[in-house]
Amino acid sequence: MATTEVNGKVCIDPAYNVTPNDSVYFDGKKVKLIEDKVVYMLNKPEKVITTVSDTHGRKTVMDYINSKFRLTPIGRLDQQTTGLLLLTNDGDLHHYLTHPSHMVAKDYEAIIEGRISDNQRKKLKRGIYIGYKEYGKAEIIKQETLKGRSKVQLRLRQGKKREIRRIFFRLKIKLISLKRIGYSNLKLGNLKVGEYRELNQKEIKSLYKI
């Protein structure tokens, strides 16, 4: 009679809840477990690094998510940038969203000293040199003046490393804070800093409609 072993022990309970981390054998042969595909949205706090683990003991985005799944961040936000970050165990979705050819829209809210002029806005739309043989592009969606400062909503599609910070450096504009508020068809909404939620199937499907 064939037996089932879970983590080296015979299992006779048909209702036993197997997790992706369990080692399962049936009749002496290893069983490959098929994981459910999940996507989480995290509102990343400041001074948290976008990585699965850190050898220097710094806080990572994984410290804020309690999940049995092996998750990978989709793209990254630098330490100082807060806001919307997606994490998933779905390799196909991860590849789709991070592939440069898909030009996924990412919306940010920046607080800056002064304001972006009409001429600078036009330059950003065409693309400006940001160093290392790269050009940064951004679409200014909205700009509001706040007592000598401005709150600017920008949309990026290229995803170059620290692109917005490099753009403002080239424009000689001081960047006070930066928060990602949208990714593809998703919005951060009222998700609090340091909190996360699981996306529903409708939201996951919307990520393919870019």
Model-derived regions, located:
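Basic, flexible Lys/Arg- and Gly-enriched helix-loop patches that mediate nucleic-acid binding at interfaces
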Residues: 1-210
